[in-house]
Amino acid sequence: PHPAGLAGTHIHFLEGVNVERMVWTVGYQDVIAIGRLFLDGQLYTERVIALSGPQVENPRLLRTRLGADMQALTAGQLKAGDNRMISGSVLGGRTVLGATAYLGRYHNQISVLLEGRHREFMGWFSPGVKKHSNLGIYLSNFLGLRPLAMTTNTNGSQRAMVPVGSYETVVPQDYLPTHLLRALIVGDTEMA
């Protein structure tokens, strides 16, 4: 699951943060930059990043610099269509547009997804031949169709949060994420 590889998850299990304990993290590429600063006396701004996502023709690693122009890095590398470029991962990055089309300081990845601007009529009623489901309720799960190309479509508008145990299966920390999210949705920060 996604959060299992994040530094915050490891900190939570090894040495949890509290009022008296402060924890710092340093990325591996920043460790290299610090080492080069002490060895050469110069600021090292090179980075190796991943160019990834279903809309990338040839996903691979790229050698670039901090704050690189993402339009230049992805020129001629993307499939045709209305694409959304994200500096960072699809879950923790930021959409880049116009003046913000640069690689983020702490990002090691460029993600590219197809914009999901279409609405499917009665999509909840379809057999879901090309849809992803965490619970395995769509036909694509039974047919073993993998990988499925993800888009930015959220398949609808705001709706009620139904507790079916999906969050509990992917969040590795020892708390109940459904209760936390429900409290945050209604603005009850005391309960959260």
Named regions from a protein language model:
Residues 1-192:
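Buried, small/hydrophobic-residue-enriched core segments of structured protein domains
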